[in-house]
Amino acid sequence: MNRLIIFVWAIAFSFAVNAQTKQFTDSIVVGDIAPEVISKDTLGVEYKLSDYRGHWVLLDFWASWCGDCRREIPTVKAIAKEYPELVIYGYSLDRTAEAWRNALRKYSLSWVNVSDVKGWSHSAPPFGIRWIPTTFLIDPSGVVRAVALNETDLKTQVDSILKNK
């Protein structure tokens, strides 16, 4: 009986560890060309991800209602400060413009931030996003160099890649 209990706990633990370490995306892998993202900022200005070819880009999918996203903001701000040449391209998966605008103001997000205010329906699917925040580091050629970064490894991964570019 004790062996059965230990076996069941071991299986449950392995599923929990796998769920924690599993990537937050099922479509994009390192080496892929990043899919196009086109959306507008709060003033209605359209931004295309491809407009930033020639630059390193940190593409961050987030939402105002997401606690993990809010906890990630100081890390993204620190990266933006340390790497001023890095383009931060935020894509909000909010469903209301008011919530999105309020979050931009509240957290003083000064980088490019766009949304279609349709939640997960439009821009998230090409990236296979299943959880937010999910962040991608894209090189100047548009190639994904890091996938599904999250708060715990975001700074380390960005440092590792950009300091060795």
Where are these regions (language model features)?
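Thiol-/selenol-based redox modules, centered on thioredoxin-like
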Residues: D139-K165
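Short loop/turn microsegments at loop-to-beta-strand junctions
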Residues: A34-P35, V57, I132-P133
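Conserved redox-active cysteine motifs that mediate thiol-disulfide chemistry
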Residues: R53-G54, L58-A78
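Loop/turn elements at helix/coil->beta-strand transitions in domains of secreted/extracellular proteins
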Residues: G54-W56, P84-L86, L109-S110, P140
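N-terminal "domain-start" segment that seeds a small globular fold
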Residues: Q20-L49, K163-N164
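Short, internal strand/loop/helix patches
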Residues: K40, R101-S141
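Bacterial Sec-dependent N-terminal signal peptides
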Residues: M1-Q23, K165
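Structural microenvironment flanking redox-active thiols in thiol-disulfide oxidoreductases
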Residues: R71-Y107, G119-P125
